[in-house]
């Protein structure tokens, strides 16, 4: 029934493409008119468009001429003309949708259309990439086009300093990575003044490789943290005990990535702990005093049984470096949380670093949803269209290719064992190599890529390896993977963002070959020779069948497999793709149904013999779909909890910004409310007789908060609670009036400066502890379901109560810190304020964890 409706009305995707095609016709209709403009007149169009927007026109009103101007500028500056399908892609981006375009269809150029149009409003456009290399490359490459139209372009890399960042954010268009943008947001909300902040708002973002950033990294929190005191030696002690455990002592759930001790394991580990004097003989492992020990054990088990070197992480310069499971790239600076990273360091016998406490955090899901308009580009988004729509309200639109795809996708070959599979892979590569067909082999881990490399070396097949160990050469290696006879091994989607061009990448080859040539004539001759060679090599590669992509294992996500296939057959080039699988592969072993294995056995699988069947391929896709659905459910569930924290983050950051934006502060409102709370908590009756206990309680609180000693003889004469409160308010009024007078003796603004700094420091201090408390609450909240309670509702209620409590502490802490302030006016008339405040256990000479680059004592530890 659905297919009949599609035939009559067309799919949603085809209807969108059809409607946008009419806009493309309008753009094409004025192409000749725009061609007649001089370079200056073309550039002046930007000023005209901005005037039209000021006079009431919308971006949609000027889309047609704006896109035509960008296309003409691109022809003149880059010698690249936007195809009609690229114009459709640009419209999709402008409309706040995801443009799914196949590899090689020119996504980088497509982004210029929507970026230019939206930059005309002057509110800023952010083009987001997955790494610094792509951000720098695209900013320099497309920057020439924007410059020709009078549009400013900025680029932020990891090493960019604060001043350069601020200037870049003030540009019309900014290129940067998701990590840089997210951490800048967190750092800005740890700054002490608006002037120190670098970002200017969240107007419009175009996210390149949107599936990688908004899906694959959705569960990865962005965290700024500082070290906390911890018993580091305990990790080593517990790690030594893990070797004593046998398989029957623990149960591993690979599907859910869980591990726990069996009854036999609990008994064994308890005895080992007692033997090593880590717990007393009359206690249980699950006693309240031993909960922290249980935490160390769980993380040590996970480190040993669930995480593997060269798959989940590598050891580099004596440190554990996490490997991104989706891209195969190193994630420098990232650390596993909750003690897992320390457990891995203990496992690998490395120096153990202290666990960190979160100072500020957010997720990419919540960060990118702050933008007024969001759009994205990728080669593979359709399989995750439900998630994009459900979480980000982003519709996926599949853009037709400029030239039909010529790639042939062969059926999967399935073998009994991994050894048989890899032997067949080597044989297949060898056959391709004989006819000079370029080959790209995708593996799921560094371990597998290096194992395959050894087999190729053994068979005397020259090749390049692209994995996290060789990240620096990534772009060059992948760019030359289309040269005839080239064999390239890549982990997952390493090199994503760089096209594989048949015959080789002329631009990169020229950059290397011409680096040491200075003579202009010699450069021209060499460049011509390189061009001829690339064209010859391209023809040889085409005759050999184009790029052959080999997958050595199916990924949990169909999208990752499609990305690998998509490296072949760019812009109508011929190509080939094939997957080699075995029953020992993780996907088939963990998620493949017994039905698949049963059918394969009935078919009589023999050694070194592959089985091909469309039914088996469909069954594998069903297994992948199950995993994708489960992962989506996990992300959706986590998002509901993250949304609670995100709402609180907005409240706290909004409060912080209000403090920063104020020039003067009336703290009397705060301390009068505080005094009322103190009196009401100690004196319960309106009329009372002051006894020693009541006086001591009042005096103790006032000394603690205000550093004031109450006079017993004075307050003992009051007959009502209201009179006591009135006297206390007057006492505190005098206390702060004297303090303000002392602070403003040389500088009228000194007191307000002090109040602002104390308020900001107090809020940061409490927010840090509040985040830790929320993390602890979230870790155990699912246990509430045992009592037939909804964990999410329980989390919302308790988190709200905790926030209220935090804000109460905040106001008290402000008054307490201001009351205990010391001041010192030096002879040179510059005022130095000394705070008698314990802020953190971070060394004062360490760099501040907020990321400012300053020493802690000159920043948040001031």
Curated annotation (Swiss-Prot):
Catalytic reaction annotation: ATP + H2O + cellular proteinSide 1 = ADP + phosphate + cellular proteinSide 2
Protein name, as recorded: Protein translocase subunit SecA
Residues holding Zn(2+): 848, 850, 859-860
Nucleotide-binding as UniProt keyword: yes
Recorded family membership: Belongs to the SecA family.
InterPro entries given in the database record: Helicase_ATP-bd (IPR014001), Helicase_C-like (IPR001650), P-loop_NTPase (IPR027417), SEC_C_motif (IPR004027), SecA (IPR000185), SecA_CS (IPR020937), SecA_DEAD (IPR011115), SecA_motor_DEAD (IPR014018)
Source organism phylogeny: Bacteria, Pseudomonadati, Pseudomonadota, Alphaproteobacteria, Rickettsiales
Details of cofactor binding: May bind 1 zinc ion per subunit.
Enzyme Commission designation: 7.4.2.8
Pfam families found in the cross-reference section: P-loop_SecA, SEC-C, SecA_DEAD, SecA_PP_bind, SecA_SW
């Amino acid at each position: 029934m659905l297919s009949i409706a599609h035939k009559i009305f067309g799919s949603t995707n085809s209807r969108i493409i059809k409607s946008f095609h009419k806009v493309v016709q309008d753009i094409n209709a004025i192409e000749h008119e725009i061609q007649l403009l001089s370079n200056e007149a073309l550039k002046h169009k930007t000023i005209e468009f901005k005037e039209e927007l000021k006079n009431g026109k919308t971006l949609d009103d000027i889309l047609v001429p704006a896109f035509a101007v960008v296309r003409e500028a691109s022809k003149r500056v880059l010698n690249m003309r936007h195809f009609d399908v690229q114009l459709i892609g640009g419209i999709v981006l402008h409309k706040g949708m995801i443009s799914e375009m196949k590899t090689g269809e020119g996504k980088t150029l497509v982004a210029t259309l929507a970026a230019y149009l939206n930059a005309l409003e002057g509110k800023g456009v952010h083009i987001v990439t997955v790494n610094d290399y792509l951000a720098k490359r695209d900013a320099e490459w497309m920057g020439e086009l924007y410059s020709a139209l009078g549009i400013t372009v900025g680029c932020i890399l990891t090493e960019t300093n604060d001043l350069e960042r601020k200037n870049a954010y003030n540009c019309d268009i900014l290129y940067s990575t998701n990590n840089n943008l997210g951490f800048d947001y967190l750092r800005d909300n740890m700054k002490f003044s608006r002037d120190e902040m670098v970002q200017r708002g969240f107007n419009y973002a175009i996210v390149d490789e949107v599936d990688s950033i908004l899906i694959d990294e959705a569960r990865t929190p962005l965290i700024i943290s500082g070290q906390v005191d911890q018993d580091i030696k305990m990790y080593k002690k517990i790690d030594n005990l893990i070797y004593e455990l046998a398989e029957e002592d623990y149960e591993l759930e690979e599907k859910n990535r869980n591990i726990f001790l069996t009854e036999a394991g609990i008994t064994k580990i308890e005895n080992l702990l007692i033997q090593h004097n880590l717990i007393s003989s009359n206690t249980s492992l699950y006693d309240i005093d031993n909960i922290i020990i249980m935490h160390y054990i769980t993380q040590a088990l996970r480190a040993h049984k669930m995480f593997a070197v060269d798959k989940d992480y590598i050891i580099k310069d004596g440190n554990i470096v996490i490997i991104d499971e989706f891209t195969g790239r190193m994630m420098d600076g990232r650390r596993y949380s909750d003690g897992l990273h320390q457990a891995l360091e203990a496992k690998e016998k490395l120096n153990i670093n202290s666990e960190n406490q979160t100072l500020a955090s957010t997720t990419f899901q919540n960060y990118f949803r702050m933008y007024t308009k969001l759009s994205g580009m990728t080669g593979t988004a359709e399989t995750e269209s439900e998630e994009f729509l459900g979480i980000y309200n982003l519709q996926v639109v599949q853009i037709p290719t400029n030239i039909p795809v010529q790639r042939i996708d062969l059926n999967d070959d399935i073998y009994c064992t991994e050894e048989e599979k890899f032997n067949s892979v080597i044989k297949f590569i060898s056959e391709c190599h004989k006819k000079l067909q370029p080959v790209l082999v995708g593996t799921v881990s560094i371990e597998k890529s290096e194992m395959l490399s050894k087999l190729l070396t053994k068979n005397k097949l020259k090749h390049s390896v692209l994995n996290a160990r060789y990240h620096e050469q990534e772009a060059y290696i992948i760019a030359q993977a289309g040269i005839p006879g080239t064999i390239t091994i890549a982990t997952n989607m390493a090199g994503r963002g760089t096209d594989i061009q048949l015959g080789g990448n002329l631009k990169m080859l020229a950059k290397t070959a011409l680096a040491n040539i200075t003579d202009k004539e010699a450069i021209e001759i060499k460049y011509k020779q390189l061009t001829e060679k690339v064209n010859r090599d391209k023809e040889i590669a085409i005759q050999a069948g184009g790029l052959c992509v080999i997958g050595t294992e199916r990924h949990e996500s169909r999208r990752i497999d499609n990305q690998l296939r998509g490296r072949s057959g760019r812009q109508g080039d011929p190509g080939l793709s094939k997957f080699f699988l075995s029953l020992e592969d993780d996907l088939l072993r963990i998620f493949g149904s017994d039905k698949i294995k049963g059918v394969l056995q009935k078919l009589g699988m023999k050694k070194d013999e592959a089985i091909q069947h469309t039914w088996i391929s469909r069954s594998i896709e069903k297994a992948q779909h199950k995993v994708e659905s489960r992962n989506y459910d996990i992300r959706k569930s986590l998002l509901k909890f993250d949304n609670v924290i995100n709402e609180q983050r907005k409240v706290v950051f909004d409060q912080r910004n209000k403090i920063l934006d104020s020039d003067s502060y009336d703290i009397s409102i705060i301390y009068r409310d505080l005094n009322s709370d103190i009196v009401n908590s100690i004196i319960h009756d309106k009329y009372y007789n002051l006894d020693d206990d009541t006086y001591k309680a009042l005096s103790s609180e006032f000394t603690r908060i205000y550093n004031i000693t109450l006079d017993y003889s004075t307050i003992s004469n009051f007959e009502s609670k209201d009179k006591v409160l009135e006297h206390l308010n007057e006492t505190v009024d005098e206390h702060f009036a004297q303090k303000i007078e002392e602070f403003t003796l040389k500088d009228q603004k000194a007191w307000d400066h002090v109040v602002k700094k104390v308020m900001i420091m107090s809020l940061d201090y409490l927010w840090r502890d509040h985040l830790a408390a929320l993390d602890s609450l979230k870790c155990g909240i699912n246990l509430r379901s045992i009592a037939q309670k909804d964990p999410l509702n329980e989390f919302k209620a308790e988190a709200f109560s905790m926030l209220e409590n935090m804000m109460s502490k905040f106001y008290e802490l402000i008054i307490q810190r201001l009351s205990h302030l010391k001041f010192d006016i030096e002879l040179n008339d510059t005022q130095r304020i000394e705070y008698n405040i314990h802020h953190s256990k971070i060394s004062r000479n360490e760099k501040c964890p907020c990321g400012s680059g300053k020493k802690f004592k000159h920043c948040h530890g001031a």
